[in-house]
């Protein structure tokens, strides 16, 4: 996986240099993989490695109303429909957005479906606070998912923040200004 992360890092950085006035180096440790597949089958490294340059060329930086639907469709495997959600709330007086996409279906062997979920926000929150909020909110939601008492070995959820909302800096996980965000994250 490190070789693929290195290739993605290199190609994304290269694309940014061509597309952006202020390109940033994208390091391989900033790339996260969510894997799904049949246990015991080899991961198709070469197929994925060969596909990366073309996939990165197709990246568009413009936002449109279909971007989250496209992202949800892009991670579907055995799902019958895309799974996405969006919430708006406030941190202090600043409006922030939370988007979530997921994949996963209620199936067990031989077609067990891995649940992968990704949450994105424009809230300006530290990694430490995001991790604490996520951990608190998955206890009775994501971590309570099972299918006939089984869970997949690769289930994962991750949260990402761009910080572009420019809300007031929050220093403590228990800050009351986070209550609306916390409630929205739990939906």
Regions inferred by a protein language model and the residue ranges of each:
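Glycine-rich, mobile lid/loop segments that gate access to catalytic sites or pores
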Residues: 2-14, 24-142, 152
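Membrane-embedded hairpin module used as a gating/binding unit in multi-pass transport
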Residues: 137-144, 156-166
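A glycine- and small/hydrophobic-rich beta-loop-beta segment
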Residues: 162-187
């Amino acid at each position: 996986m490190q070789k693929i992360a290195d290739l993605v890092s290199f190609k994304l950085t290269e694309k940014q240099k061509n597309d952006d006035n202020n390109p940033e180096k994208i390091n391989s440790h900033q790339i996260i993989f969510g894997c799904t597949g049949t246990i015991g089958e080899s991961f198709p490294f070469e197929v994925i490695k060969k596909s990366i340059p073309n996939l990165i060329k197709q990246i568009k930086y413009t936002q449109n109303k279909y971007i989250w639907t496209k992202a949800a469709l892009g991670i579907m495997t055995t799902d019958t429909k895309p799974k996405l959600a969006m919430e708006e709330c406030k941190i202090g007086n600043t409006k922030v957005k939370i988007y979530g996409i997921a994949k996963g279906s209620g199936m067990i062997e031989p077609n067990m479906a891995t649940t992968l979920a990704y949450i994105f926000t424009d809230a300006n929150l530290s990694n430490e606070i995001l991790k604490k909020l996520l951990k608190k909110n998955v206890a009775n939601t994501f971590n309570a998912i099972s299918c006939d008492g089984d869970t997949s070995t690769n289930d994962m959820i991750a949260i990402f923040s761009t910080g572009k909302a420019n809300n007031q800096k929050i220093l403590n996980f228990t800050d009351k200004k986070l209550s609306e965000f916390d409630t929205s994250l739990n939906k």
